[in-house]
Amino acid sequence: MKKILIPVSIIAVLLCTAAKDADQTVISPDRLFLADNGKSLFVTNRAGSELIKMSADGKEMEQKVEFSSPVNAMTQDPDGNLWVVCDGNYGMMYQLDGKKLSIQSKIKSGATPSDILYNPLSQSLWVAQRFNNELWEIDPATRKVKAKITVGREPVAMASFAGDSCLLIANNMPEMPSTAYPLAAQLDIVDVSSK
């Protein structure tokens, strides 16, 4: 898998130059996502609670989708659907048609879902629940929670590894009651087949 790292500041400059009028202004680009095997670039506008699809050359905004709150993460399933989780105490998970970017479904998804990924081995969506301190496995066909797994405090990011058989979860805070905590927190590993 090839990863492309683009500084958010470069995307911010591109977004400013791509905005042709006031309603295209992007105040706070926050996250970048690649879809369609790296052919589509998406950026979030945190202040506008928007997901923006950029042109292939990165010079124009092709389409915007507005959500109930800021987008925290996005993934794509093998059918081309985009799955988005949004911030907030009553966080939401959205399913979008990958071509039209129209919202197909919207469900409540815990307290501040912070990351989402599709795992081909389990054929499930996995959602890190930051303030529930849980990892949820969700069936994309039914959008029902299949499993809730307790992980460390404030899980904020995750990645598949070992042939997609495991998930590495990064937690924002260590397991200690003090607020004087080090910057480095803890990592959890979840075996997707045995949970």
Predicted feature descriptions by range:
Residues 14-195:
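Predominantly soluble domains enriched in secretory-pathway, periplasmic, or organellar proteins
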Residues 7-14:
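Bacterial N-terminal signal peptides
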